Amino acid sequence: MSGSRKSLEQKIEALAALRRTADGSAAEAPLRKALADSNGFYVSKAAALVEHFGLQSLAPDLVAAFERFLDCDPIKSDPQCWAKNALIAALHTIGVRQAAPYLRGLRHVQLEPVWGGQADSAGALRGKCALALVDSELTAYQILTALTSLLVDPDKQARLDGVRAVARVAQPESALLLRLKTLTGDEHPDVMRECLLSLMTLIPAASVELVARFLDPENELRCGDAAEALASARHPEAFDALLAFLRQRIPMTVRRSALLTLAASPLPQAGEYLLTVIANEPAEAAEAAITALGASRFREEHRANAATLVKQRCTGDLTAAFDAAFAPR
């Protein structure tokens, strides 16, 4: 083992010892020194400890370290943005509302060598900065202006966190941006799912028609995401749209997926509908309804009725599904 590697491991072990033995005040001085180090991995460990202890007094040191790693050679000092990710997480956690570091991180691109070329390792950093910016000193309009670029970021994680950040701003303009993002689409299912869920949280009544457009059995994954968004909403029209879809002739795999989303519904109608499925529909759909009901907030309210319906159908598979779904928690 080289001397430099041994020295780094010793320093990291010293930080681990701080976590085990020190309170925040005793850790402040050694952590201030650690944040000034040139090794990104080591600084990432120090920043995580600052976050752990909630040391607001070290906010200037966190900012200085973040700016230093932005300005130096990233491949040598901070590969994979180890330090920068941890520094932004610490700044956000201890409540730093100064927007400057988050705005700089939002624009940072870090190309690193990979097999066959280069890849950007800063997507997650841009996403973290987006989420932190929501709690910054800026106005909602300024925040949304800065976040808009992330909705079309080349990196999937940055786009996903960008959608989440826009939704957290929770302004009418947020809904417009998310509506536009939904209409233009995204190649990654997780991003589209987040858009649909966010719209049904921000403006449920105005979003039902748009979200329901994605109830397309030809795209099972997208259809399931739309069903989940509608099912989780507190708006009766959202439930009605999902119910209308479930009454259509759709493949059983799609039907099962849509039924399972009703476990998240806050509306009493959902529990009542699941009982009708248990009573009247084919075993595969009834099993999904039993599973959904057992995971729902109406579990205890409808346990007895569901047990009676399962007993009436005299099907071993449904009995097994009921026993699994309503097993003691």
Question: Language-model segments: what does each one mean?
Answer:
Residues 2-23, 41-57, 73-96, 116-138, ...:
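Structural detector for internal amphipathic alpha-helices that build alpha-solenoid repeat scaffolds
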Residues 25-42, 57-76:
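Internal amphipathic alpha-helical repeat/solenoid segments
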Residues 30-32, 61-66, 101-106, 146-148, ...:
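Buried hydrophobic core positions in alpha-solenoid tandem helical repeats
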Residues 61-68, 86-93, 101-104, 128:
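Generic beta-strand or strand-like secondary-structure segments
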Residues 66-67, 107, 217-218, 279-283, ...:
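TPR/TPR-like (Sel1-like) alpha-helical repeat modules
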